[in-house]
Amino acid sequence: MKILGIETSCDETGVAIYDEEKGLIANQLYTQIALHADYGGVVPELASRDHIRKTAPLIKAALEEANLTASDIDGIAYTSGPGLVGALLVGATIARSLAYAWNVPAIGVHHMEGHLLAPMLDDNSPHFPFVALLVSGGHTQLVRVDGVGKYEVIGESIDDAAGEAFDKTAKLLGLDYPGGAALSRLAEKGTPNRFTFPRPMTDRAGLDFSFSGLKTFAANTVNQAIKNEGELIEQTKADIAYAFQDAVVDTLAIKCKRALKETGYKRLVIAGGVSANKKLRETLAHLMQNLGGEVFYPQPQFCTDNGAMIAYTGFLRLKQGQHSDLAIDVKPRWAMAELPAI
């Protein structure tokens, strides 16, 4: 069974092909970073138009990479939510049209389920059950995972996602878009303990997160530094970046430890764009070593949005006979609890 996967939920156009016997046999990705850089963030209309231009050529490139033709494809998976509605519609329309033309089934895939299952693309993949930390620009969730489609969100951000807080704080520091990765690189030059940021919602019971206060704290710290120094010098920027990242990572680690204790699980999966963060990986690896458990991450190329995770997730569901109807339907907001189990 060979499944074509299409990802167009935000600012990456991803196309991949997953083979039941060989695994991932094609992976094509185009990023719109340069397109949105001048605006300091994703412009939905521009994102949609660029997906229109890039999706079909990437499908052709993926087929060529795998040395396949359209007749070799057994099904099509596409991201149907959550995400930007216009961007989602581009991928859904192309996927449904091809499925009709090629006479194969198609299925809409939940974007965050794709991220959650991305570590399964690795040879050293986690076994169920496990706790998953989904951490990206749009989501920060702790999920109890007992199988494919057997998800319970046990904690989530009540305001900003961790990735969003990274990007907004990076903007305060004058860093280029995309800011999260730039902030992490800058933090490596920072001085520990010069600034201390709070660890929000760690002093109370529960597994929910809140990162909007950290953004405000960062803004106040920047303003005070400018007042004291006359301008924001590079070392001060690095020191603020270090303190901010340390607070976010520490907060995530504290909540992960609680979630593992509550569930009794010994496996932790970290997925989503922020899972590529070096400091986060090191901290959670140390945590799981101390707890006698295991931690799993996607390969770096599968941390950000990609077609491979959509192709794989679609394969799992199509193999069980699940598929979407002919309607081109997308869900900009979509709870994982609504997904059927396999």
Swiss-Prot record:
Cofactor note as given: Binds 1 Fe(2+) ion per subunit.
Gene Ontology biological-process annotations: tRNA threonylcarbamoyladenosine modification
Enzyme Commission number(s) from the entry: 2.3.1.234
Positions annotated to bind Fe cation: H111, H115, D305
GO cellular component: cytoplasm
Pfam families from the UniProt entry: TsaD
Principal place of residence: cytoplasm
Keywords: Acyltransferase, Cytoplasm, Iron, Metal-binding, Transferase, tRNA processing
InterPro entries: ATPase_NBD, Gcp-like_dom, KAE1/TsaD, Peptidase_M22_CS, TsaD
Subcellular location(s) per record: Cytoplasm
SUPFAM superfamilies: Actin-like ATPase domain
Binding-site positions, substrate: L134, V135, S136, G137, G138, D167, G180, N277
An MF annotation (GO) of this entry: N(6)-L-threonylcarbamoyladenine synthase activity
Keyword DNA repair among record annotations: no
Cofactor(s), by name: Fe(2+)
Reaction(s) this enzyme catalyzes, per UniProt: L-threonylcarbamoyladenylate + adenosine(37) in tRNA = N(6)-L-threonylcarbamoyladenosine(37) in tRNA + AMP + H(+)
Role description: Required for the formation of a threonylcarbamoyl group on adenosine at position 37 (t(6)A37) in tRNAs that read codons beginning with adenine. Is involved in the transfer of the threonylcarbamoyl moiety of threonylcarbamoyl-AMP (TC-AMP) to the N6 group of A37, together with TsaE and TsaB. TsaD likely plays a direct catalytic role in this reaction.
Family under the similarity heading: Belongs to the KAE1 / TsaD family.
Designated name of the protein: tRNA N6-adenosine threonylcarbamoyltransferase
Organism placement in taxonomy: Bacteria, Pseudomonadati, Pseudomonadota, Gammaproteobacteria, Pasteurellales
Gene from which this protein is expressed: tsaD
